[in-house]
Amino acid sequence: MGKPTGFQEFSRQTVAYRDPLTRIDDFDEILTAPDEDRLQTQAARCMDCGVPFCQSDTGCPINNLIPEWNDLIYDGRWQEALERLHRTNNFPEFTGRVCPAPCEGACVLGIIAPAVSIKNIENAIVDRGFSEGWIVAQPPATRTGKSVAIVGSGPAGLAAAAQLNKIGHQVTVYERADRIGGLLMYGIPNMKLDKQTVERRVNLLRDEGVTFVTRTHIGKPEDFPQGHVNQIMTERDQRLTFLDPTQLRKDFDALIMATGATRPFDPTARCPGRELSGIHSAMDFLTRNTKSLLDSQLTDNAGISAKDKHVIVIGGGDTGADCIGTSLRHGCRSVVNFELMNRPPVERAASNPWPAWPTIQRTDYAHAEAEAKHGADPRAYATLTKAFVGESGRLAGVKTIKVDWSKPDGRAPFTEIHGSEKLWPADLVFLATGFVGPEKTTPDLLGLNMQNPRGNWETIAAEHGAFTTSEPGVFAAGDCRRGQSLVVWAINEGRGAARAVDEYLMGYSTLPAPGITMASV
């Protein structure tokens, strides 16, 4: 422990964002450059905890060695801190930018004071590692002669690929989009995660021996989902290749399904006027925008433009905030965010004790931007969408009603508050209401069993820790197995699945995985 009294001497400070009114003029990353001296001071706030809950079940899902690298940063030993960080996290430059940081919610210091700024420190470590040239390709010295196919190039698929390649297996990753990265590339906008950051890591994996195949759908042409965001990304070049998953299984020694949860949940499906033009899924909006940005700096007019439009985003969370931020950068006339739940408390409620994730009021980057631009927080809480209204088939407004929850935590049914009806002007509506599971055509072709772990959600049946499906040699990891979740959980799943595959192929494994502590391979 570098400074035993650091948590008493120093207050929490975080890396600043660029000015809201400046950053909405571009899609550059919102983070400013960190002050490394300040970060060393922040690392000193890490306490000598008897039990570091930041690494517990309620903390970091990949068991990052947070106290260790905080201590090393305080001592100025950045390269050693990077080695500790990479032991448990293949992609700290992703989690350091987009993770909500459950580790900070479980920080022991958080009981009496603001938590250690773990996420900022993590991001600074890996960014310095790249800038100093410490992070270089390390291909395996020998190959095992075994081959693994991974379907999906999101964080789960990439983490599995990194681990399996590192141990010497030949890995091929299939992606139906035109760029590798899955959610990291097209689901998270550039101002939160610059795509050069994603491509930098993908190129590193390629240099280490991972093979990437894009524009390839694992399934039949007739089963390709109509109107899906990936079809949008391929319809212009007409270069999509189709591969039979059963043949893929025969061609490789093992197969990992890491396809994500891409079937959107639409709570407005039965609302009058749902068929009106102008209502889109959040992923359609964000994906089209990022592709247009990368292809042409938005000059090809291939995206959904919010310029001069009244925009309503239905659903909170990160995706809802990203729709707000993207709409502001387009130059929308107004933006409102409907949230069905009540406004959270400013501080933890008695029913939400530490070290559980704190359900409190937060202002995300996009909320701050909307307030700076339009003068008010864009969120309308306890608001239920009742109907869409329009003219000549085109959306013109949204009817809502306020709801009353019988319990503040929202676990009991709500009642509508009569007399609270309102008509909101709307030219565009984006549905940021989550996902119900993976597309089922490829699992069906492989004969995989499905399960319903959470209500309407349906995922590929594969036990956590084993990741084996109903078909020998076929594994599942990430959101397609777990259900929609965080990038850090996807990395957890990818690392765990990699170890399971390695054990299947070799009879044993020396690969580390969450919950299994060993030196980096």
Say what each PLM segment does.
Residues G320-G325, H330, C480-L511:
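A conserved FAD-binding loop/helix module that cradles the flavin
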Residues T5-T32, A44, N63-D75, E83-L85, ...:
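Beta1-alpha1 glycine-rich phosphate/pyrophosphate-binding loop at the start
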Residues A124-T142, N203-T214, P264-H330, N452-S470:
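Glycine-rich dinucleotide-binding loop and its adjacent helix/turn
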